Amino acid sequence: MPKAREWWSNLYKDFLALGIDGVWNDMNEPAVTDDDIPEENRIGTMPYDTPHRGGGNLPAGPHLLYHNAYGRLMVEASYEGIMKVNPEKRPFLLTRAGLLGYQRYAATWTGDNWAGWDHLKLSVPMSITLGLSGQAFNGPDIGGFLNNTDADLWAHWLGFGVFLPFARGHACAGTNDKEPWAFGEAIENTSRIALERRYRLLPYFYTLFYEAHKTGVPVMEPVFFADPKDLRLRSEQQAFLLGDNVLVIPAFAENPVLPYGIWENMTLIYGEYSDKYQAKLKIKGGSIVPVGKVIQSTTENSF
């Protein structure tokens, strides 16, 4: 209902007055804890026949109709509430649920993944698919949300995860610590190199996000965007492009299918290619990629 969305939107003024810069709308399908229901009967949300009143241009209907729309309407209300308070500042909003058009208001992530090599490898095609579906600002929980993560898995994941549009490490309560410094000095150094590489590429990311905002072209592209006529590239799910000019090849990739042409190694940080976990970066011949300095926080940037 419009009145409910207005009520929700107005709640943000109190949060933002505390100095909060970003908001995360989580479990907004909405999720329902149903542990007391037999597993085969769980649906994870409210019963599908739960009525929604609608309102405005929206008809009344069951939750089966509104399940995805609920998250979409929620993030729109959240966005409007943030903009009321800070109209001169671009808001950061993250959502788990949404529907067509929600990319105008919020970033998203790929859900509660597992700490395992299969989910690490799925990160690339899942993020590419979200981008092709209109949601340019997306990425997985680096390191895996559920289950424990070992040092090797974490380092491999972060080594390419820093080049995903939304780069974030996350963990479920009850799993092991998954901070960049949690796996010893060597992996801490690996993490530092990876994060500094992303910081240096922030001007390029900024440009790609602006282009995505204006045109809908994703930030993270499948490699066949380099040459749509090259049928070899259609099935590649390990390497990916950042815009037209940067090719990312994760360290885990085995015999990736790469586009023809001139692609030169791109160096951003001293020692990056002596670290086995870092993704290889290649710059397209004849192109220009803007890069910045190594910084400690995005607040040090002028854009």
Regions found by a protein language model. Name each.
Residues 1-278, 282-284, 299-300:
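Catalytic-domain carbohydrate-binding cleft regions of carbohydrate-active enzymes
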Residues 287-303:
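Edge strands and adjacent loops of beta-rich recognition modules
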